[in-house]
Design a protein with these regions (language model features):
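Hydrophobic, Leu/Ile/Phe/Ala-enriched alpha-helical segments that form helix-helix packing faces
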Residues: 40-45, 117, 121, 180, ...
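Catalytic phosphate/metal-binding cores of nucleic-acid and nucleotide-processing enzymes, i.e., regions
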Residues: 20-23, 100-101, 133, 205-207
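Mg2+/Mn2+-dependent nuclease catalytic core
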Residues: 63-175
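Accessory terminal regions of nucleic-acid processing enzymes
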Residues: 2-13, 85, 132, 167-221
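Short acidic alpha-helical/loop segments enriched in Asp/Glu that coordinate divalent cations
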Residues: 49, 53, 124-130, 190
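Non-catalytic, well-ordered alpha-helical scaffold segments
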Residues: 31-35, 111, 193
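Short aromatic-enriched loop/helix-cap "lid" or pocket-rim segments at secondary-structure transitions
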Residues: 44-49, 150-154, 209-211
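Metal-dependent nuclease catalytic cores that hydrolyze phosphodiester bonds in DNA/RNA
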Residues: 1-87, 97, 219-221
Length: 221
């Protein structure tokens, strides 16, 4: 859903959209939730979650090149869970209101991490492939506060977990990567009429570069 021109500029030229950092409170909640799950079965949190032990938190991945393209995957997933059958569940943890729309929004991201885990980049000077991890399930673990109580001098927020299964569709993922490859191999796409950053960049450039007009040098602050 990202603007195609903004994506092109980011990947091809390293020009990122300006962004605000995540508020510290969300990072703190996210880190504590993830960290306290490592080494534990998800059933410790809720019996409604899949049966499996969280083995890794915030793991970096990098893939081999996706076949038929010049694209590779690089990024960081949230949680990796080992299932009873020795395969793995890949989990994206969100502090957000749960909703089925999240499945569509994050399925490509989870599919990308799945590909990277199953097709790891070759280590420098090592064998053809790194350690392959088989991923048989994808899911979203979503927390959203719904109650608060005051006790013993503390405000205690309740964060009940919600679980959403994300279907695996390797064929759809490869088709999507093919489109990405085609986009990056061509000329820059046009500005998006609905992208606020494109509008800001375009109008800002016009207003800031006014040819021989006056420029304010003696700034008041």
């Amino acid at each position: 859903e990202e603007c195609k021109l903004c994506y092109y500029l980011k990947i091809k030229h390293g020009i990122y959209q300006p962004s605000m950092p995540m508020p510290g409170v969300f990072s703190a909640i996210n880190t504590r939730l993830q960290g306290n799950l490592v080494g534990k079965n998800l059933h410790v949190l809720s019996k409604n979650l899949p049966d499996g032990e969280v083995v890794t938190q915030e793991g970096w991945v990098e893939s081999n090149v996706v076949p038929g393209t010049d694209v590779f995957i690089k990024g960081k997933y949230d949680l990796l869970v080992k299932l009873p059958d020795e395969t793995h569940l890949l989990v994206d943890l969100k502090i957000s209101q749960p909703g089925d729309d999240k499945i569509e929004k994050y399925k490509t991201q989870l599919g990308a991490y799945k590909f990277a885990l199953e097709n790891p980049a070759s280590p420098a000077g090592g064998p053809k492939d790194g350690k392959k991890i088989v991923v048989s399930k994808l899911g979203l673990l979503i927390f959203y506060p719904d109650r608060v109580k005051f006790e013993k001098g503390e405000a205690v927020l309740s964060f009940p977990p919600s679980w959403l299964d994300v279907p695996i569709d390797d064929e759809l993922f490869l088709e999507f990567v093919g489109k990405i490859d085609k986009l990056l191999a061509g000329a820059p796409p046009a500005e998006s009429l609905s992208c606020k950053w494109c509008q800001y960049r375009h109008v800002g450039d016009q207003l800031a570069h006014v040819g021989s007009g006056p420029v304010q040098d003696d700034l008041p602050f």
